[in-house]
């Protein structure tokens, strides 16, 4: 299952700030037809930190209902009981897997990290994808802990966004004898990570250029390294544009520019600066051949 491109999708809101359920359905239906391997709702890109529990659950239910591809639902929390609740809900709603970020802010030690993920995994049979993004959480999920967690039967993959290829290499080395997948969590490192043995990406840029991202990953996995390199560099300006400001500010702004359902950001995220919005618009205009599916 964990092979290919999994866009981490945005959560569209109406002008009054409420969830845009129809817009969410339209976005997912369009993305589902672009060759992607799955969608990831309620992650960082989906503004999960500002969703109420009811909204979080509703988003998962809607995406499961309308998606033609597997759904990997974000269910992480820095409260283990809350993560268990959200993970069980995702399983009951019909999600195909759950993505769990490392507990943030309270910065658990390695024993706490292991026990957190073990407890969540034991609470449900749903496949679990670990998510390591220390720049956001303040805590590092070290390769040796990942290796221990990979021995738990339903912990089956990791989204690795540490930015360290050394770490990625070590995780793949330590889990080589397990049925355990490594997915890139950094669009700009997807190709290098594939070279180390990763099998796909949970992607931001695939929201706006899904087919090109899919082609890049598939080209590499099929052995066409030259074509994968060409697409890596072709996508590079768009990848940089997606991170002109904190994710998901640029990608949500891009969706608005492309005519997709987006709506406002929720505070404390604020609109892009005029300067960066102009840069983003320029990149989208120049790369319209890659974003045509999302117009």
UniProtKB/Swiss-Prot annotation:
Keyword Amino-acid biosynthesis recorded: yes
Listed GO biological process terms: diaminopimelate biosynthetic process; lysine biosynthetic process via diaminopimelate
Binding site for pyruvate: 45, 202
Pathway recorded for this protein: Amino-acid biosynthesis; L-lysine biosynthesis via DAP pathway; (S)-tetrahydrodipicolinate from L-aspartate: step 3/4
UniProt KW Amino-acid biosynthesis keyword: yes
Predominant location: cytoplasm
EC number(s) per entry: 4.3.3.7
PROSITE patterns: DHDPS_1, DHDPS_2
Enzyme class at the top of the EC tree: lyase
Catalytic activity from the UniProt record: L-aspartate 4-semialdehyde + pyruvate = (2S,4S)-4-hydroxy-2,3,4,5-tetrahydrodipicolinate + H2O + H(+)
Location in or out of the cell: Cytoplasm
Keywords: Amino-acid biosynthesis, Cytoplasm, Diaminopimelate biosynthesis, Lyase, Lysine biosynthesis, Schiff base
Function in brief: Catalyzes the condensation of (S)-aspartate-beta-semialdehyde [(S)-ASA] and pyruvate to 4-hydroxy-tetrahydrodipicolinate (HTPA).
Name this protein carries in UniProt: 4-hydroxy-tetrahydrodipicolinate synthase
Species per Swiss-Prot/TrEMBL record: Methanothrix thermoacetophila (strain DSM 6194 / JCM 14653 / NBRC 101360 / PT) (Methanosaeta thermophila)
